[in-house]
């Protein structure tokens, strides 16, 4: 109002002048705003890679395009809270990446001139500058810091965990809670997995001046001890690194290794108080006979008196105990009310209890039981007072451990003088008193107590009571009561439940009296208010159990230091370090600098996939090329040359690197004239992943490399010959997408020298999509060409050109080619004595379908069948005669296409007579050379699936490798002579490479015969073969398998139409196997070398893919209602109780006795077991456990369920079969002799009922132990329920309180259960330590060899141990 009045008092001309100038200034500002609004803006997306918590977050800036780079850095620094100049910005993974060089932060160049693009996302990475973490801006106000600290005081979520709270928010970007070492001055510790409890304790010890200084004074003697196993030395190193390292966090693996822990220990959760005690014990052992021998006692040990006083005569028995920490109860037993404070819990700790009633105390003076007072009195408090808040309890209602999250306050300063009882010191001690109230203690008089203290003369323990005079001691205590003031400096916090959680530490620095949160690798400043949040509890009402909504983050251990200016130490300054610590500091700094240099090299190293087709081996090799970004392309070729080990294969100048797309098998471009270009520029910078690969291309010395230009497409051209019905291996032609089909034909014509006028071009776009290119003016792009393409061309003068494409011979040939797969077939080895000597009939060449005639033809004069050897030899001779006949036909017919195109099997009639005749002359000649049925090399191969799987001599080979190893492709260059492309890079066979690629991402289809109750019969009900099909293309060649497949092993490489049925496929293999298809089995071999039988004869081979392996095994094919059964022998008293015998066939409706009769000759012939039918039994097999005993009259599928690949136990009997009825129960008993520490052999006990009384009676009869002394326990785990003799006496549940065996906890309802029994009057053998260790070695070795040791009980908590020799005793676990 005053301004308005004063303006009205101005002269009129001056008023208008002021108004005009104001309007002009406003117009100028509006113009600037309007111009800024019209100026293009640049969107910058910055990712902070300096911190693990922020690496997944983004900060966005939208700035004008005219912004200088210098201003951009200032804006980024302001946004993220870093000091400008302490970080770098480099290009991220966007399309504009050309270099990883940091952007110049002092440049006045605009961001537009620097390469930033308006209207697009510009990705930037914020990185360390010169290997150092960015510096954090100092907060002017405590508000932001406090709020950040509120977030940070709690346990940080695991990196990568789902659902964790994100402290790093893009909108309100603040780093105050994640302070780097440069701000706090402290370094964090990396959590190995679950070592947060260790990190909390180590940081507390590091922040304790007295402990750190004493540790530094200790000097390690390398000549006396291994530094790796020295705990004090590794702690020294860790503390030095915590003081001097520039890293945000350092590893603790060297410390845990000195504990003797392996990597699995990092995954064990332990208690921080447990670790504290164990570590102090270990340090005391290591520091024996050194200056620090009594350090732990001096700093942490206190003393208290455990007493019992008779209330009638005043007589008192007592003993002196030492302690390292005081355990304080959170909530008294049976109470729902927790103690409110630590002081209240301390009072309860020393509160005496009255022993009365049945708990009366026997007084030595009164010579009778009297009421007494029992309690504890503190005699001495340590310099460093440790209080454990017992937050973990056991709930006897739910029988589970629980955590008590009740609120319990603790003061920053704790006065302990009120807990020293001076009256106790004044009480007369003239009377002798024995500690009959304390266990394992002798008499304890007052002079003995004095002697306890006098033994500590000269030891400075804070509050010393070393005077022998009671009066002096009382005076000392009285004078020091006022000096027992302790200062809190460490709070170890637990967040979580009794099942698990997270530890971190809140520690006050004695250097600046500031509180810090040490949460694994994160260190931050906190306040006193944050400490109060660890009291526990919640503001609302809370029931007995911990609630998910109540705070589960609360203090667990408190450490106080006595306030005594005379004794309170400060941390040693660097100039005060002992010489050995100075040397250690220098050594660690050098190591850190070396690591920094190595990280810098890694950060500037390009890592990319490298491929190379080996010029001689013709296999595609793969490796990772690591090259510094400043290395030139020429240098990178040399590195790749050595990496691929080509020194002896090809000269270096015959190699080059080209850009390659491995997925599409496409050469994108070559790098002519760029030999001196740095790899970083060539590859588009250093990236974690690249969207392309590199290929090390090779050539012969007389060839020249072709130039590959970007934008070209690669076309693999297969020439089709309709006369020979063959498809040639591909040649590679590079074309352009804007070329027409007519121009493309001309290009192919130059490459193949075939006329373009009659050329038919078929493009294979995808599986079963064969498109004839008929429109000459269409471009390749319009026809659907892509980076890598496959075409088939045919250019003959045949009339097939005028037939409709889908009816043409060309289409049929290509359709067959597209469905042809290559399989590797392992033929069986055969030997005399095989079970197939009987009932095997060789099919004659005239009619393979008539089995009756075949049977008659192979019979001798006496009607006996020929041996397998004769049959196979005849098969071989027949193949040879067929080959000779074909050769004669070729000679007679001359150029007749019929004879040259005939298949080896043309003259072998099949049920369908539709075998595709497509073998070339060369293939036929190869086939004629194979000798499948050499009788001198025949071996039997009757093994179980377990043997097959575990003892496999051949391995599955990757389909890509096999499919690329046939013949070299030819690369056509219209200007230069044709040369092989990358020495066979694109090599193919008759097999389509497209299918190999398509099948890579598809899992193999497994046969599901295991799920069926039976299998398809090879013949239908009328006896007609099921193998008839129109898809009968089948061509075979001999094949030499990899080394290790076995000498004499015969292999076939078969090209077959995958639409053929399994039945027809087996019939095609008959001449090579030498037996009818009904007498051999087909097993498919998977990548893990596991074999599964293919039994569905009506199904096609469509589930098979290129280069699958097939194993043929002799054995009769199953008929309807038949099942293949694996028979194992049960050997209860052998180290390996389960032994495979043979494969048998059981049929539906067959009785157990009938199956036993069929097994007898097979057992005699194949296994050498000459048994009578009543000398063995069959029983159920479940994994390795014996089960129900099958009785002779049981019928399969009626009384006994049976399935494919069923397994059964055969058990040889020692006497007459005792099992006669299903109401009986057969158990396996084993006696335990504790006095001898040994187990007897198994003995079977047959019970008439499930009565425990009957079991004990039978065991008593068997062993001679009186019935009343029999104790038994059920075995645990799988048969034979092995258990160490050191554990069996205590670990088993002996003599369960049940009357029948079929109830909890036994549940013995079936045969085969294992029962251990013993004489309860037999004493356990007492072992010396030497005997125990020796027995432990033997037992461990025995159990490991048998492989029967199992974990049958719920996982027990593993005791925390520190091994002073650096490692656990290996002899205890292995022989």
From Swiss-Prot:
| Composition bias type Basic and acidic residues, residue spans | 940-950
Note the Gene3D superfamilies from the entry. Answer: Cysteine proteinases
Q: Where is the composition biased (Low complexity)?
A: 881-890, 953-969
As for subcellular location, the record says: Cytoplasm
Residue ranges annotated for the USP domain, each copy included: 187-563
Name the UniProt key words of this record, in alphabetical order. Cytoplasm, DNA damage, DNA repair, Hydrolase, Protease, Thiol protease, Ubl conjugation pathway
Family to which the UniProt record says this protein belongs: Belongs to the peptidase C19 family. USP47 subfamily.
Which named protein is this? Ubiquitin carboxyl-terminal hydrolase 47
Q: What is the species of this protein?
A: Gallus gallus
């Amino acid at each position: 109002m005053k301004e308005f009045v004063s303006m009205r008092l101005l002269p009129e001309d001056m008023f208008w002048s002021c108004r005009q100038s104001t309007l002009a200034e406003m117009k100028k500002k509006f113009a600037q705003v309007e111009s800024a609004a019209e100026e293009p803006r640049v969107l910058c997306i910055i990712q902070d890679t300096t911190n693990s918590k922020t690496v997944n977050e983004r900060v966005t800036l939208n700035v004008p395009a005219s912004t200088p780079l210098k201003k951009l850095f200032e804006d980024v620094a302001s946004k993220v809270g870093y000091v400008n100049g302490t970080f770098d910005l480099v290009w991220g993974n966007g399309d504009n990446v050309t270099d990883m060089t940091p952007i110049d932060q002092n440049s006045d160049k605009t961001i537009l001139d620097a390469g930033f693009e308006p209207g697009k996302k510009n990705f930037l990475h914020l990185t360390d500058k010169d290997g150092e973490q960015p510096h954090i801006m100092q907060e002017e106000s405590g508000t932001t810091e406090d709020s950040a600290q509120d977030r940070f005081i709690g346990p940080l979520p695991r990196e990568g965990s789902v659902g964790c709270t994100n402290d790093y928010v893009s909108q309100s970007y603040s780093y105050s809670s994640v302070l780097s070492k440069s701000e706090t001055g402290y370094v964090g510790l990396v959590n190995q997995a679950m070592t947060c409890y260790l990190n909390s304790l180590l940081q507390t010890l590091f922040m304790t001046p007295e402990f750190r200084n004493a540790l530094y004074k200790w000097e390690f003697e390398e000549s006396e001890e291994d530094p790796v196993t020295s705990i004090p030395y590794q702690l020294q190193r860790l503390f030095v690194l915590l003081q001097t390292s520039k890293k945000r966090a350092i590893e603790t693996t060297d410390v845990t290794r000195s504990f003797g822990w392996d990597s699995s220990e990092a995954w064990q959760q332990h208690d921080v108080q447990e670790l504290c005690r164990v570590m102090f014990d270990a340090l005391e052992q290591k520091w024996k006979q050194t200056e620090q021998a009594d350090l732990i006692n001096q700093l942490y040990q206190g003393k208290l008196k455990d007493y019992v006083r008779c209330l009638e005569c005043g007589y008192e028995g007592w003993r002196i105990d030492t302690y390292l920490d005081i355990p304080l109860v959170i909530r008294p037993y049976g109470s729902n009310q927790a103690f409110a404070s630590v002081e209240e819990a301390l009072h309860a700790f020393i509160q005496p209890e009255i022993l009365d009633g049945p708990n009366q105390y026997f007084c030595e003076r009164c010579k009778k039981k009297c009421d007494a007072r029992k309690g504890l009195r503190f005699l001495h408090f340590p310099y460093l007072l440790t209080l454990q808040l017992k937050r973990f309890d056991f709930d006897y209602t739910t029988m589970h451990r629980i955590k008590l999250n009740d609120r319990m306050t603790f003061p920053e300063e704790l006065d302990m003088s009120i807990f020293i009882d001076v009256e106790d010191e004044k009480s007369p001690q003239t009377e002798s008193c024995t500690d009959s109230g304390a266990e394992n203690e002798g008499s304890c008089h007052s002079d003995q107590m004095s002697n306890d203290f006098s033994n500590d003369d000269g030891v400075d323990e804070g509050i010393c009571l070393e005077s022998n005079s009671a009066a002096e001691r009382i005076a000392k205590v009285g004078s020091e009561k006022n000096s027992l003031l302790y200062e809190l400096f460490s709070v170890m916090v637990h967040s979580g439940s009794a099942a698990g959680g997270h530890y971190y530490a809140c520690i006050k620095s004695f250097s600046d009296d500031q509180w810090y949160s040490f949460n694994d690798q994160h260190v931050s400043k906190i306040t006193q208010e944050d400490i109060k949040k660890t009291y526990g509890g919640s503001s609302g009402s809370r029931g007995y159990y911990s609630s998910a909504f109540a705070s589960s983050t609360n203090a667990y251990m408190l450490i106080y230091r006595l306030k005594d200016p005379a004794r309170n130490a400060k941390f040693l300054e660097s100039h005060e370090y002992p010489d050995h610590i100075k040397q250690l500091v220098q050594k660690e700094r050098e190591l850190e600098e070396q690591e920094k240099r190595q990280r810098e090299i890694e950060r500037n190293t390009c890592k990319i996939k490298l491929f190379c087709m080996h010029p001689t081996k013709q296999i595609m090799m793969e490796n990772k090329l690591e090259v510094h970004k400043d290395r030139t392309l020429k240098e990178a070729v040399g590195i790749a040359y050595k990496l691929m080990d080509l020194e002896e294969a090809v000269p270096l100048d015959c190699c080059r690197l080209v850009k390659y797309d491995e997925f599409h098998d496409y050469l994108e471009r070559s790098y002519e004239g760029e030999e001196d270009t740095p790899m970083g520029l060539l590859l588009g910078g250093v990236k974690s992943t690249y969207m392309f690969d590199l290929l090390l291309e090779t050539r012969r010395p007389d060839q020249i490399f072709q130039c590959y230009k970007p934008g070209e497409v690669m076309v693999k051209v297969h020439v089709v010959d309709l006369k020979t019905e063959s498809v040639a291996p591909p040649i590679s032609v590079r074309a352009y997408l804007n070329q027409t089909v007519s121009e493309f034909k001309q290009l192919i014509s130059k490459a193949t020298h075939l006329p373009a006028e009659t050329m038919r071009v078929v493009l294979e776009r995808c599986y079963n999509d064969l498109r004839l290119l008929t429109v000459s003016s269409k471009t390749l792009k319009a026809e659907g060409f892509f980076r890598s393409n496959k075409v088939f061309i045919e250019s003959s003068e045949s009339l097939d050109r005028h037939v409709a494409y889908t009816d043409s011979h060309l289409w049929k040939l290509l359709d067959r080619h597209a469905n042809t797969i290559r399989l590797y077939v392992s033929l069986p080895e055969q030997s005399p004595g095989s079970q197939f000597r009987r009932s095997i009939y060789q099919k004659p060449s005239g009619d393979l379908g008539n089995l009756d005639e075949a049977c008659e033809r192979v019979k001798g004069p006496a009607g006996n069948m020929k041996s397998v050897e004769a049959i196979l030899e005849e098969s071989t001779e027949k193949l040879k005669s067929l080959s000779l006949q074909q050769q004669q036909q070729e000679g007679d017919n001359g150029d007749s296409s019929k004879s040259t195109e005939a298949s080896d099997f043309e003259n072998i009639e099949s049920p369908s007579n539709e075998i595709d005749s497509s073998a070339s002359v060369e293939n036929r000649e190869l086939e004629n050379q194979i000798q499948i049925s050499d009788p001198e090399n025949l071996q039997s191969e009757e093994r179980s699936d377990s043997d097959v799987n575990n003892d496999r001599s051949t391995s599955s080979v990757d389909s890509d490798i096999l499919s690329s190893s046939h013949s070299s492709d030819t690369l056509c260059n219209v200007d230069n002579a044709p040369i092989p492309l990358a020495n066979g890079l694109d090599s193919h066979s008759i097999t389509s490479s497209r299918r190999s690629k398509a099948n890579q991402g598809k899992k193999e289809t497994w046969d599901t015969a295991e799920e069926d109750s039976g299998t398809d019969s090879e013949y239908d009900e009328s006896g007609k073969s099921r193998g008839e099909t129109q898809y009968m293309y089948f061509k075979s060649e001999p094949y030499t398998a990899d080394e290790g497949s076995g000498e004499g092993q015969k292999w076939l490489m078969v090209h077959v139409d995958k639409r053929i049925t399994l039945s027809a496929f087996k019939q095609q293999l008959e001449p090579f196997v030498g037996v009818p298809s009904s007498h051999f089995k087909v097993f498919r071999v998977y990548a893990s070398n596991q074999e599964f039988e293919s039994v569905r004869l009506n199904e096609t081979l469509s589930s098979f893919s290129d280069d699958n392996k097939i194993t043929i095994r002799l054995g009769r094919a199953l008929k309807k209602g038949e099942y293949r059964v694996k028979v194992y022998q049960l050997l209860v008293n052998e180290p390996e109780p389960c032994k495979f015998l043979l494969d048998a066939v059981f049929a539906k409706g067959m009785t157990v006795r009938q199956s036993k009769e069929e097994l007898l000759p097979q057992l005699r012939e194949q296994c050498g077991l000459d048994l009578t039918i009543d000398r063995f039994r069959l029983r159920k097999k479940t994994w390795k456990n014996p089960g129900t005993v099958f009785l002779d009259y049981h019928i399969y599928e009626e009384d006994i369920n049976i399935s494919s690949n069923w397994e059964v136990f055969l058990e040889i009997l020692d006497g007459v079969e005792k099992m006669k009825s299903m109401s009986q129960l057969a158990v396996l008993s084993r006696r335990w002799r504790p006095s001898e520490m040994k187990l007897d052999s198994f003995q079977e006990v047959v019970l008439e009922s499930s009565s425990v009384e009957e079991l004990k009676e039978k065991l008593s009869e068997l062993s001679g132990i009186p019935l009343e002394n029999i104790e038994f326990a059920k075995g645990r785990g799988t048969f034979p329920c092995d258990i160490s003799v050191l554990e069996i006496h205590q670990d088993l549940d002996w003599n369960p309180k049940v009357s029948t065996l079929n109830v909890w906890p036994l549940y013995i309802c079936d045969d085969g259960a294992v029962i251990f029994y013993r004489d309860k009057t037999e004493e356990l053998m007492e072992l010396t330590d030497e005997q125990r260790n020796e027995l432990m070695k033997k037992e461990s070795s025995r159990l490991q060899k048998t492989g029967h040791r199992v974990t049958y009980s719920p996982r027990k908590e593993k005791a925390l141990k520190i091994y002073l020799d650096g490692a656990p005793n290996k002899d205890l676990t292995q022989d």
